[in-house]
Amino acid sequence: MLNLLEHRGILSNTLVVATSDNGMPFPRVKGQAYDDSDHMPLAMQWPEGIRNPGRIVTDYVSFIDFAPTFLELAGITEKQVGMAPIAGRSLNDIFRSAKSGQACAVRDHVIIGRERNDVGRPHDWGYPVRGIVKNDLLYLHNFEPARWPSGNPETGYTDCGGSPTKTETLKTRLSPKQEHRWELSFGLRGAEELYDLRRDPNCLKNVAGDAAFRAETLQLRVQLFRELQAQADPRVLGRGQIFDEYPFASDELRGFYERYLRGEKLDARWINDSDVEPLPLPRTR
């Protein structure tokens, strides 16, 4: 592609973006909200548009910034093309800046979240999470902590695709010395999680309940909910059930949990038969 753009003489004035999907297909990563799930590779090239190259910039950016960037560079607004209001910000402020470090003051954090990734829970419900990353801290709020974060055990933890890694991790549930690996990947979680990404980039130690992080937990919770309210997120406005009521897109898999437990043969090709627990597990933490 780059060779073609160069052949046509437009490479230097073309914004080229290379990024990826969210999360590797491993337990506690794919479909989750931890740093390895949401911290994606991103490379952008635009020789004529990115001023002062060689700078090291620490601003947080998000996928939701792409659309406003493309619209601004094209000279049009979301209203002109019939789009809903955009929560992201154009990256042009970074492209045009001369600053290193924090180039744009409002980019000192990023909001993340998840709802339903796959079927496998009662009523096709998801596992709603909202989070904020700021100052190398990751704060997560789990709105339904009584639900299984990777899908129900009796339907195969369907939010995590089958793999040798998943198989070996599931085996640790019955090992007193290794059970913590199962807990981290598939066990129930509390309503709040906080991780110090400098010391714990793999998000293994939840410090939300530690006295040393009490102030940071409160500050991030307040900022997260304030911004979600400004965005009219139904989860913080008392209407979160609307996400659970959306029908699953696939007719073949809609109502998966109830149909599976009735004995119906369903094509759950993304998990292994051995992923399925023979009986529901107790809901304890």
Question: Where would I find each of the regions flagged by the language model?
Answer:
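C-terminal cap/loop subdomain of S1 sulfatases and analogous C-terminal strand-loop tails that border
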Residues: 76-193
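Substrate-binding rim/cap in mid-to-C-terminal beta-strand-loop elements of soluble/periplasmic
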Residues: 2-7, 28-108, 187, 205
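Long, internal low-complexity/basic segments
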Residues: 39, 175-192, 197-203, 207-285
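Short catalytic/ligand-binding loop motif for oxyanion handling, primarily in non-cytosolic enzymes
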Residues: 25-28, 34, 119-120, 140-141, ...
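Short acidic capping loops at alpha-helix termini that bridge into adjacent secondary structure
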Residues: 12-14
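Active-site metal-binding loops of divalent metal-dependent hydrolases
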Residues: 22
